[in-house]
Structures are given as structure tokens and as C-alpha cells.
Amino acid sequence: MPRKGPVVRREIPEDPVYSSRVVSQLIGRVLLSGKKSLAQRIVYSALDKVSMKASEDPVSVLRKALDNVRPSLEVRSRRVGGSTYQVPVPVRSHRADALAIRWLTVYSRARREKSMVDRLASEILDASNGVGATVKCKEDTHRMAESNRAFAHYRW
């Protein structure tokens, strides 16, 4: 906890094309080595592919994908008397959004398609349909929290 008072959360600007904060966050996660224009080109091209394949608004498909990926529980390590327990805790909304976007980019990079545009578009479509590696990661996180429910009373 900081001594100077509460930390003010930075306001994320909307992206210029879709006027969406979610797209802006996704661009920030795709960004590597400070190449923001390249990250924007990748995300916008991927969203164009999503709109062609899904034949609906790409931002709504992205939001649906993030809703399917957003975790509600996670485990945190808690040391009690010489042993470490995995304690399930609820995830705050900002962290849940950040985790969903992070998982989406990580698992899209791990895909086998040729370009990052194709990988990101495919992962967004898979996540919006409730399948894919990103959704599996969320289910694994929930399964881990469920299996350690006995240690929930150690929550701090």
C-alpha cells in the first residue's frame, strides 16, 4: 500500500477507429518493442477479418470473446505455518479484463497460422464461440480454484 494515498487509475484513451477502450487495450497488449503503428495495423486487420468471417460488428464479437474468457476466480499463494496453500480468491473487474486480454494475445501468438493477423482473428472467433486455448486457460484457472476450495478460509 502506498503511503501517499490511493493510486489513481490511469484513464485509457479510446482508439481512433472503433472508439473503444477494449480495442485500445488490445493494441497495447499486441505491441512489441514500441511499434504501436504495427500493433494497430495487426489489430485492425484482425478485426476486419473477424467482421468478414462473423458477418457482425467486430467490437461486439471481441466483447463476447472477452466475456467468455474473463475469469471470476483465481488462486493466490498464501504461506501458513511452513506450508504454502493455493487460496481461491475472486478476481477484481479490472484484473479480470487485463487477464482476458493478456490470455487472448498470448494464446494467439502460440497458434500455428501464418501471420499474427490470422492468429489473432482466429483466436477472437474461437473465444467468442466458447472454444480455443484461451477459453481452456480460463476453465483451468476456475478448475484450480474449485479444487482448492477447502483453503478458501485462508483468504486475507
UniProtKB/Swiss-Prot annotation:
Q: Which PANTHER family match?
A: RIBOSOMAL PROTEIN S7
Report the function annotation for this chain: One of the primary rRNA binding proteins, it binds directly to 16S rRNA where it nucleates assembly of the head domain of the 30S subunit. Is located at the subunit interface close to the decoding center, probably blocks exit of the E-site tRNA.
User: Could you say which protein family the record assigns here?
Assistant: Belongs to the universal ribosomal protein uS7 family.
Sorted alphabetically, which HAMAP family does this protein's record hold? Ribosomal_uS7_B
Determine the domain of life of the protein's source: Bacteria
Q: In Gene Ontology terms, what is a biological process of this protein?
A: translation
Entries under Gene3D superfamilies matching the protein:
Ribosomal protein S7 domain
Q: How does it assemble?
A: Part of the 30S ribosomal subunit. Contacts proteins S9 and S11.
GO molecular function annotation: rRNA binding; structural constituent of ribosome; tRNA binding
Pfam (any one): Ribosomal_S7
What is the protein's name according to its record? Small ribosomal subunit protein uS7
Q: Which UniProt keywords apply?
A: Ribonucleoprotein, Ribosomal protein, RNA-binding, rRNA-binding, tRNA-binding
* Keyword Ribonucleoprotein attributed: yes
InterPro entries, alphabetized = Ribosomal_uS7, Ribosomal_uS7_bac/org-type, Ribosomal_uS7_CS, Ribosomal_uS7_dom, Ribosomal_uS7_dom_sf
According to its UniProt entry, this protein's organism is: Tropheryma whipplei (strain Twist) (Whipple's bacillus)
Instruction: Quote the cellular component terms of the Gene Ontology held in the record.
Output: small ribosomal subunit
